[in-house]
A protein has these predicted regions:
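Catalytic cores of DNA base-excision repair glycosylases
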Residues: 2-8, 12, 16-140
Length: 140
């Protein structure tokens, strides 16, 4: 077990390392749960470099839950083309339709986890990044 001074030192070193080595990614510049959710779904089984090319274009076309929920499937899939795994886009639209009916994005890990196509990793990422909830984002 680490002592409190050791924990503080480790924390300080990790934050220093991150400040030097972090990547400037567009989805790290927002706390909007919708935008973070879109990025996390796009990043499932897809390289970061590929997602960067699609993320902002996708959000320009579907800037909010309502626009994604109401989009014709052909339009959605055309904007997803190139990312592969089209079931992700279809699940995203189903989730957007559910959220649109409720009127707000779920603000808890459990609520996010219940959305179609959302697993533990994505739910933890959205909960921790968008809502500052203490959920570890563990890839496995």
């Amino acid at each position: 077990m680490l002592s409190e001074p050791e924990i503080q030192l480790l924390r300080s070193r990790l934050l220093h390392w991150f400040s030097i080595n972090k990547r400037d990614l567009p989805w790290r510049r927002t706390s909007d749960p919708y935008a973070i959710w879109i990025s996390e779904v796009m990043l499932q089984q897809t390289r970061v470099a590929a997602v960067i090319r699609y993320y902002e274009r996708f959000l320009a076309r579907f800037p909010d839950i309502g626009s994604l929920a109401q989009a014709p499937e052909a339009d959605l899939l055309a904007h997803w083309a190139g990312l592969g795994y089209y079931y992700r886009a279809r699940n995203m639209q189903k989730a957007a339709q559910q959220v649109n009916q409720v009127g707000r994005f779920p603000a808890s890990y459990e609520g996010i986890r219940e959305l179609p196509g959302i697993g533990d990793y994505t739910a933890a990422a959205v909960a921790s990044i968008a809502f500052d909830l203490p959920h570890a984002v563990v890839d496995g």
